[in-house]
Curated annotation (Swiss-Prot):
Its EC number is 2.7.11.13. Pfam families: C1_1, HR1, Pkinase, Pkinase_C. It catalyses: L-seryl-[protein] + ATP = O-phospho-L-seryl-[protein] + ADP + H(+); L-threonyl-[protein] + ATP = O-phospho-L-threonyl-[protein] + ADP + H(+). Residues 96-123, 624-636, 658-709 have a biased composition (Low complexity). This is Protein kinase C-like. The gene is PKC1.
Length: 1174
């Protein structure tokens, strides 16, 4: 409270000072008739009044903050704690809140939820519910270009932007001046008088620029008001991956300057000549003619730019032979491109009748089968009652594309004072430019390429191209729009030349990987980090990014002055008083000295337990490395990680010392399973701490088997087998288990008798499916096939008694199964089949098929229609070249795709594409899938617009497919019309699992940049960690496209689409039904934690929304609802529902010339599979 009072007094002093300046300017106006002086005084008075308005708005914010802090300390109701606020309303329709609380919409959810063995889940209430729309965060509708305009109403964000920009420009100009002074001294030593004079003139100009920058910086520092509640005003102002250099044609017209402080001249001499210099990346591109009236009539400059970031415009006064800079302006080229995109969109929407959701009227009527009415003068062209809408033709009433020239014409602020009138346009050079927003079309998915990882003391350095000004964490010098090295684990950032000098260990490295003899610096003085008011350009000493303004996210050491982000504090080593460069130099010298000494003792490689090699059991007293439960060392878990993704599983209990080696693996397994039930009955299991089963054994050694058994009962993640080498590979690894399990085991009664059926993840399985495997007498890392699940039917209530063949199963296979207690505790989390599951069906190969047609092509392969030679059954076969898989490091992603297919096969989900078989040849791998002859929804929506009923029907079936994936820990990440197939009975099947990610439960996150541009969620574009809520964002885009026959976010290329996703609000026809707008608004919420479906109940939130009020989910799941459309074919091999671009291609396998080595072929061992229903 004292800080607030102090800030209020400070703001009041600033208001008084501005008022005094305005009074002085008014007094001066009375004593002069000079037009130039009067114009300058008018500008000062206008600026002063604007500053007063800004300060008064900050005073109101402070008063509100003071009032809120007082209310927070009050108890609102008797007996209610201040820390237990009132229950907010749910994420659903705000106006329909009372209606939902009275029973929801139809209430069939409980019938469907029993299908997966769970209890009925209603939409979440507190604390998972979002606030009502009236209190939702408003996104500011401005760009960076808006902030540098003279009349911008966004003065607060402008102050933040200019403080950062001016501080950086000042530091760069000082470095430039130091370089010039060195040149002056060099030329003086050489006696080159002409070059010395030129350098001296540059030094004088640089000094003058420094004075301008200091003057401007002081002005903005005086205007800045530090309020704790201030955060970043706009997330899209600093997009780490999108502010990249651009190439194209720039047109710039300079009209006039005004309110500038001209150079002083003699009383009787003429005024100075004024001209403007235009620079692009320090290269002069144009210069205006000199003028004495601050105006130019025909100053148009057209020039091409190549991979440039910024334009610098400098206004000069020329007095005699001297040039004096009087005003400066910097414009990012990407900001010009973004402004032109927004203007183009605004022009299209001016008369279309489409508005943002918050501007919708009170249209509450529900139209039974809505077809949006076009504006007057246009005739409907799609849907029932109208002809089909051909591909590329815009839906009725949609905004029409703008084809005329778009120009930016405005007054922009000069620094430190003045303004300049500019007209600009920019045409990008893009190789993949497409017509702006002409309906829906096919677009391929993008995936972040796997980068070469360089490991340095636990850091996993990857080369990154930075489009912001970064600061090296080692040498503290800048990286200006350059490539650097960044650790993919902790985000430590440095120059490419500096990363070999880094010898401080990455904090994400576990203690087990620390060499006891590694070099250590006896300088353990922790920093005293505290919040500070960041008013200028300061950089994080760890990740290298510029710090935001304000106090919320910034820390500063009181002793040494080091600054960093609040979330980077725990990454900074305890080297207070010593720079990182000096610390690393000392550590390097220590290591060099030790390296020269005797190396008789064993090295690190002989002491560390490595997952790739067999390791002896640890002694009972030796604790294992702390870390996530069930998580192995980073070396193994990242070796085959899909897309180098950084998984963040839900938090769990810490590891404890491993089980004593005297216990056998079977005893450990028995004890763990027998105590799981008693340990779990004490308290309910939360969504983040529930059990989740691993998929395969890691070892046969007693210690590792015991640890794996114990982990299996409680660990949130599962350790999957990375490969399926023969037993001779001899790989093994150990893992710890949580405290609760060890304690419960010590208190357990006599272990239960060995019963394989208890450990199975299915109620029963046919005896014929079991193949007893011999138990080797040495540690192995071999994987055993899981029993094939039966077709979906009502499961028996009690497990059957094991047969003799089942009793002979090896202990390792028993350990791969899930205990019933884990299934009973969290019904939504199920066993994931191993990647090397062979299946139980008949083995097939390439000789069994004839290829008939090409059905589609993607970034990673092609899909062909094939029939079996004997039965003439039709299948769709996805063909991938092994050479491509290995070259692009896609081995693990191919395994992952197979595992996701097995998850879909497990219950034969009605809306997921099933896999019949996998096989391989020397050059290719093949996925044999069921053939869906109705084509995809992209083709059908191009033929004609969907009505509401049809879109709702498809959305409901897709929702159940995503629900099943999420219940099995899979996020889909590539939801789009192209990947939704239509069966001949009118139902859908979701296909293409190439971008799926496993082990993604509630609370888990990953960070790979992948997906189809129009469907990618903002958190993916912002390089943030994301969870399964990205699927619900894509679900919102999908519903929007099905209802309106166009995408909510449009652009000519991927960059424009990304900008639209981050900055634009989706638009809707003015008469669109309220329920449709509501679900889209809640699914297309940029904050993932506020998005519908982001809570622990996942799809249940969406299923209970008013948009699906008439849906009976049990009937949808069992296909008892009559589909609204039935596709037609003339024969079983008719491919008319597929794109002729693909079907016209001859279905042949192109020859592959390369020969893979034995080691490469070994990567695909165990890929073959055949389903029991094939």
């Amino acid at each position: 409270m004292a800080n607030v009072e102090e800030t209020v007094a400070n703001v009041q002093r600033k208001i008084d000072r501005e008022k005094a300046l305005i009074n002085a300017a008014n007094a001066m106006r009375q004593s002069t008739n000079n037009p130039a002086v009067l114009s300058r005084l008018d500008g000062q008075i206008k600026d002063g009044r604007r500053n007063i308005d800004y300060f008064e708005s900050k005073l109101r914010d402070l008063d509100l903050q003071r009032t809120t802090s007082g209310v927070d300390n009050m108890s609102l109701q008797p007996g209610r704690s201040p820390t237990n606020p009132l229950t907010p309303p749910p994420k659903d329709n705000w106006d329909g809140y009372a209606q939902q609380d009275q029973g929801g919409y139809g209430g069939p959810q409980s019938q469907y939820s029993q299908l997966s063995g769970g209890e009925a889940l209603q939409p979440p209430r507190a604390p998972f519910a979002a606030p009502p729309p009236a209190t939702a965060n408003k996104r500011p509708n401005y760009s960076k270009l808006d902030l540098i305009k003279y009349d911008t109403p966004h003065l607060g964000p402008r102050i933040q932007l200019m403080l950062t920009q001016l501080e950086f420009k000042l530091s760069v100009e000082k470095q430039y001046k130091d370089g010039i002074e060195k040149m002056v001294r060099l030329y003086q030593m050489e006696g080159d008088r002409k070059s010395k004079q030129d350098a001296e003139a540059k030094r004088i100009e640089s000094n003058q620029k420094i004075q301008l920058l200091k003057h401007s910086l002081k002005r903005y520092e005086d205007l800045h008001v530090d309020i704790d509640g201030d955060g970043d005003d706009n997330d899209s102002l600093d997009i780490p991956s999108q502010r990249k250099p651009l190439s194209g044609q720039l047109s710039l017209r300079i009209h006039a300057v005004a309110d500038v402080d001209h150079a002083a001249t003699g009383r009787f001499s003429r005024g100075p000549e004024t001209f403007v210099n235009i620079k692009v990346e320090d290269t002069i591109k144009g210069r205006t003619k000199p003028t004495r009236n601050d105006r130019w009539t025909d100053e148009v400059h057209d020039f091409s730019i190549d991979k440039a970031n910024e334009i610098e415009i400098t206004v000069y006064d020329k007095t005699g032979d001297h040039l004096l800079p009087i005003g400066m302006l910097w414009v990012r080229i990407s900001d010009i491109a973004e402004e032109m995109r927004r203007k183009k969109l605004e022009t299209e929407l001016a008369n279309s009748g489409w508005v943002a959701a918050d501007k919708m009227g009170g249209h509450t009527g529900i139209q039974p089968d809505m077809q949006f009415q076009p504006p007057p003068g246009q005739s409907p062209a799609g849907g029932p009652g109208g002809g089909p809408t051909p591909a590329g033709v815009r839906p009725p009433g949609a905004p029409q594309p703008q084809t005329g020239p778009i120009m930016i014409d405005d007054w922009f602020s000069l620094e430190p004072v003045g303004r300049i009138h500019l007209t600009m346009s920019f045409i990008k050079n893009t190789g993949n430019k497409q017509p702006f927003d002409l309906g829906l079309g096919r677009k391929g998915a993008v995936r972040q390429r796997k980068e070469d990882v360089v490991e340095q003391y636990g850091h996993k350095f990857v080369q990154q191209q930075f489009y912001n000004v970064m600061r090296c964490a080692l040498c503290a010098e800048f990286l200006k729009y350059a490539a650097g090295m960044q650790c993919s684990d902790c985000n430590y950032t440095c120059h490419k030349k500096c990363y070999p000098k880094v010898v401080t260990k990455c904090i994400t490295q576990s203690n087990a990987e620390t060499d006891p003899d590694e070099a250590k610096l006896n300088h353990r003085i922790p920093h005293r980090f505290e919040n500070f008011s960041n008013m200028g350009a300061n950089w994080c000493c760890h990740c290298g990014y510029v710090l935001p303004l304000g106090r919320k996210q910034t820390k500063k050491c009181n002793e040494c002055g080091l600054t960093c982000h609040a979330h980077c504090v725990h990454f900074v080593p305890d080297f207070c008083g010593m720079s990182m460069e000096v610390a690393n130099q000392i550590l390097m010298e220590i290591k060099r000295t030790r390296r020269g000494q005797s190396s008789s003792g064993p090295g690190m490689s002989q002491r560390t337990l490595r997952p790739q090699s067999a390791a002896k059991p640890l002694p009972p007293t030796q604790p294992q490395s702390p870390g996530q439960p069930g998580q192995e060392s980073p070396t193994q878990s990242d070796r085959y990680s899909y897309g180098k993704e950084q998984m963040s599983p839900p938090p769990g209990p810490p590891r404890q010392p491993s089980y004593p080696s005297s216990a056998t693996s079977v005893d450990a397994a028995r004890a763990s399973y027998s105590t799981t039930g008693t340990a779990s009955t004490g308290a309910p299991t939360s969504p983040t701490s529930g059990s989740r089963p691993p998929s395969g054994p890691r070892t046969q050694s007693s210690v590792a088997a015991a640890a794996a058994a114990m982990n299996k009962a409680t660990q949130p993640g599962y350790g999957r087998s990375n490969t399926d080498y023969s037993p001779q590979s001899g790989r093994s690894s150990g893992s710890g288990y949580p405290t609760e399990q060890r304690m419960s085991q010590q208190q357990a009664p006599q272990p239960a008798a060995y019963d394989p059926s208890v450990y199975a993840n299915i109620p029963s399985y046919p005896p014929s499916h079991q193949q007893p495997a011999p138990v080797p007498s040495y540690p192995t890392k071999s994987s055993y096939p899981l029993p094939q699940p039966p077709p979906p039917q009502s499961p028996p209530q009690h497990p059957q008694q094991p047969t003799p063949s089942q009793q002979k199963m090896p202990e390792q296979q028993a350990l791969t199964q899930q205990p019933p207690s884990a299934v009973g505790e969290v019904p939504g989390k199920k066993v994931t089949p191993a990647a090397n599951t062979q299946g139980t069906g008949k083995r097939i190969g390439l000789d069994h098929f004839n290829f008939l047609a090409v059905l589609g092509k993607g970034n990673f392969g092609k899909v062909m229609l094939a029939e079996t030679k004997t039965t003439k059954q039709l299948y769709a076969i996805k063909v991938l070249k092994k050479e491509f898989i290995i070259e692009n490091d896609e081995v693990e992603s191919t395994r992952s795709e197979k595992r996701v297919f097995l998850i879909a096969n497990k219950e034969r989900h009605p809306f997921l594409l099933n896999l019949h078989a996998c096989f391989q040849t020397e050059t290719r791998v093949y996925f044999v899938m069921e053939y869906i002859s109705g084509g995809d929804l992209m083709l059908h929506i191009q033929r004609g617009q969907f009505g509401t009923k049809r879109a709702q029907f498809y959305a409901a079936e897709v929702c159940l497919a995503l629900k099943y994936f999420h219940e099995n820990g899979v996020i889909y990440r590539d939801l789009k019309l192209d990947n939704i197939m239509l069966t001949l009975d009118g139902h859908i099947k979701v296909a293409d699992y190439g971008l799926c990610k496993e082990e993604m439960w509630y609370g888990s996150t990953t960070s790979t940049f992948c997906g189809t541009p129009e469907f990618m969620a903002p958190e993916i574009l912002l390089d943030k960690k994301y969870g399964r809520a990205v699927d619900w964002w894509a679900f919102g885009v999908l519903i929007y496209q099905m209802l309106l026959q166009q995408s909510p976010f449009r652009g000519e290329d991927e960059d424009e689409i990304y900008d639209a996703i981050l900055a634009d609000e989706p638009l809707y026809p003015i008469h669109m039904p309220r329920d449709s707008v509501s679900i889209l608004q809640k699914l297309l919420t940029r904050e993932p934690e506020m998005r519908l479906g982001s809570g622990p109940t996942d799809a249940q939130e969406i299923m209970s929304h008013a948009f699906f009020r008439n849906i009976n989910w049990d009937d949808i799941y069992h296909k008892r609802v009559q589909p609204p459309f039935i596709p037609q074919i003339t024969s079983p091999t008719d491919t008319s529902n597929f794109d002729t671009e693909f079907t016209s291609v001859t279905p042949v396998l192109t020859p592959v010339q390369s020969v893979l080595s034995q080691a490469m072929q070994e990567e695909f061992r165990g890929f073959s599979y055949s389903a029991d229903f094939a």
